[in-house]
Amino acid sequence: MQYSQKVLDHFMKPHNIGKIENPDAMATEGSPACGDQVSIYLKVNAKTQVIEDIKFQSYGCASNIATASIITDMALGKTLEDAKKIGWKEAADALDGLPPVKIHCSVLAVDTLRKAIKDYEVKHNLAKADKFNKETIVEELKKIIYPQVGEDIVTLKMVKYAGFE
């Protein structure tokens, strides 16, 4: 598997790594199928809604660490609204590409950033918390990829929805 020099640089010397004590918001996302996990911590200026500090912790492969690193670089100094617009393709492009089997790492990093922003918005009454129901569970499970076949957990019917049948 060939990695770009930017991926290797962000993997070997990740930016914004660590944990913010008393963050304004945080989120942890992961994929049980591949074992990757990312946590993102935010400090946000309450008046301007600008991300003043952002840190991440990652458990995963080189692509996972590199995409979390680049996402934090891209979000730092942006308003929450602008940071929400950062997409997985933009993150992968900023790293000069990712191997096709590692694109899910940029999706995971973007999802984690958006969940951290949502956490901030909910805590500050800027958004409502998502409802917990069968549809939200199914949507979350569609993000979990079974790596040997590249299909999502829902399609493979590897789970049952306890209490929703």
Where are these regions (language model features)?
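Domain-level signature for proteins that mediate thiol-based redox and metal-cofactor handling
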Residues: 1-165
